[in-house]
């Protein structure tokens, strides 16, 4: 592959710029429902929002209380965020006074045992989804599962792939070239993933109730009545306190090629876990988990980025990738942005565009175990002390200061921003905005959060509740068109009908037989 700056130059004509701008994006935003006192909602998913099993835009994640809003795929940043805003506005109007918790880390949970696991009806598909979540509860506890985040889906245009393929040696088929190039993007992303918690990490603090009873070596400082924080942390969500899986630490799944990745995932699905076997699979006639393997299903594999392809009915993610290769990637390292009603803002999306294009267009050597260890250490350093003055990160040849590394990255991104902007200024403005946070760590999202809590002496829970109320009013006042509202009404009804159809179609097959068929062997 040509050097990055040469590639940017190669795409500098109108046709090349159009190929770069043909990006497709989607956003998935998770948010807990809370009551007016700030406590986790314990009721079921609101019926007016439709079926969480079959609705394309409004579903649930781990819990009945953990809403997930999904945008359709979109070419335009503004319409992408408008669609996400409309989904929020419609949903809030059907929450009967409940609010959305606008940060990643949960707070007011009276009893972890009462966190309601998501339910999806009586079809075997729905029962399997609930049972998978029951397994997560037994394995890791419920509290960890209600940490919320934002996922960003990204793909580039066929025109860009054609141009890049023409520049390659064409030793691969076109489809294989696309998959291998996406894995090149993934490897470079993993080398630089620490950039995202540095800029966008927004969970340097949490309520002390979250770690009640947990052992931790982290030296928290206290603020307000019940706030714990680390002075230089960026994203406790991405730390060992958040969603990590010690059972997965030894999987060593390779991102060096699609075949190696698929082989690793398939091996993990079949790898037995002594710890999880102790839970039991079916005890006294009742399932506790889908199986006792390291991963119950592929979705349990934790990674800050995933290679994806839209699946056909009944198809596993790895089967879709094996069938037709990588279609898009899913970025999973984003905290909820508490300063945006929808958890993410346009300048973040544009930075992600630049960042991911850079990861794609930069040469990406294969990784080895020594590099993987460095990458893991760098990410851990940044999530726990990313704003620490003079922080050094590991490179192949020694160490480099985080700030120096970031400034070099921003310099590289600037030529791409100029090209994408053409006659406009949106990408350059986004880059300038976040460059300020490189120079002044207080301007990162985590820096801004700690200014609210520590400098102003606010309690974490109270501050988040005030934001929840503010955003609740924002969505109530949002000018949702009658056409948009009718469209959501119609999908709510059609999704419920689809669930009923699925339940009827699967009624003759027992859950045992369904799981045996799904896994190809007794669960």
Curated annotation (Swiss-Prot):
It comes from Shewanella oneidensis (strain ATCC 700550 / JCM 31522 / CIP 106686 / LMG 19005 / NCIMB 14063 / MR-1). Its EC number is 6.3.2.2. It is an enzyme of class 6 (ligase). This is Glutamate--cysteine ligase. GO terms for molecular function: ATP binding; glutamate-cysteine ligase activity; metal ion binding. The gene is gshA. Keywords: ATP-binding, Glutathione biosynthesis, Ligase, Nucleotide-binding. GO terms for biological process: glutathione biosynthetic process. InterPro entries: Gln_synth/guanido_kin_cat_dom, Glu_cys_ligase, Glut_cys_ligase. GO terms for cellular component: cytosol. It catalyses: L-cysteine + L-glutamate + ATP = gamma-L-glutamyl-L-cysteine + ADP + phosphate + H(+). Pathway: Sulfur metabolism; glutathione biosynthesis; glutathione from L-cysteine and L-glutamate: step 1/2. Belongs to the glutamate--cysteine ligase type 1 family. Type 1 subfamily. It comes from the Bacteria.
């Amino acid at each position: 592959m040509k050097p990055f700056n040469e590639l940017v130059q190669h795409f500098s004509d109108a046709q090349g710029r159009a190929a770069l701008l043909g990006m497709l994006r989607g956003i998935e935003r998770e948010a807990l429902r809370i009551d007016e006192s700030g406590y986790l909602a314990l009721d079921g998913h609101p019926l007016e929002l439709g079926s969480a099993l079959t609705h394309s835009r409004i579903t649930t994640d781990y819990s009945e209380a953990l809403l997930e809003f999904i945008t359709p795929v979109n070419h335009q940043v503004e319409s992408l965020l408008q669609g996400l805003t409309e989904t929020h506005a419609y949903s809030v109007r059907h929450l009967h006074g409940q609010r959305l918790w606008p940060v990643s880390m949960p707070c007011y949970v009276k009893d972890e045992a009462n966190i309601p696991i998501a339910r999806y009806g009586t079809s075997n598909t729905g029962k399997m989804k609930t049972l998978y979540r029951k397994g997560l509860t037994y394995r890791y506890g419920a509290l960890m599962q209600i940490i919320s985040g934002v996922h960003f889906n990204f793909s580039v245009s066929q025109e860009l792939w054609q141009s890049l393929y023409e520049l390659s040696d064409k030793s691969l088929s076109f489809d294989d070239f696309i998959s291998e190039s996406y894995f090149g993007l993934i490897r470079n992303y993993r080398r630089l993933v620490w950039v995202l918690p540095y800029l966008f990490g927004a969970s340097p603090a949490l309520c002390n109730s979250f770690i009640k009873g947990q052992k931790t070596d982290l030296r928290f400082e206290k603020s307000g009545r019940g706030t714990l924080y680390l002075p230089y942390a960026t994203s406790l969500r991405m730390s060992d306190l958040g969603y990590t899986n010690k059972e997965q630490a030894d999987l060593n799944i390779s991102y060096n090629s699609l075949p190696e990745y698929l082989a690793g995932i398939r091996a993990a699905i079949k790898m037995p876990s002594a710890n999880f076997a102790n839970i039991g699979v079916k005890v006294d006639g009742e399932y506790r988990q889908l199986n006792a393997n390291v991963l119950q299903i592929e979705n349990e594999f934790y990674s800050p980025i995933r290679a994806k392809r839209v699946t056909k009915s009944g198809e596993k993610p790895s089967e879709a990738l094996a069938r037709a290769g990588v279609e898009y990637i899913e970025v999973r390292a984003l905290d909820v942005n508490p300063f945006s009603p929808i958890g993410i803002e346009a300048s973040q999306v544009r930075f992600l565009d630049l960042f991911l294009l850079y990861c794609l267009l930069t040469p990406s050597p294969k990784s080895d175990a020594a590099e993987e260890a460095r990458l893991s250490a760098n990410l851990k350093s940044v999530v726990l002390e990313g704003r620490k003055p003079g922080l050094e990160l590991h490179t192949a040849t020694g160490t480099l200061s985080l700030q120096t590394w970031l400034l070099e990255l921003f310099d590289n991104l600037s030529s791409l921003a100029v090209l994408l902007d053409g006659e406009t200024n949106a990408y350059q403005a986004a880059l300038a905005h976040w460059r300020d946070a490189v120079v002044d760590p207080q301007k990162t999202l985590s820096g801004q959060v700690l200014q609210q809590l520590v400098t102003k002496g606010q309690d974490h829970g109270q501050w988040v509740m005030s934001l929840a109320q503010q955003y609740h009013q924002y969505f109530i006042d949002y000018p949702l068109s009658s056409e948009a509202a009718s469209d959501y009404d119609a999908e709510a009804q059609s999704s419920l009908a689809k669930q009923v159809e699925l339940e009827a179609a699967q009624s003759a097959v027992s859950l045992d037989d369904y799981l045996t068929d799904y896994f190809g062997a007794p669960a």
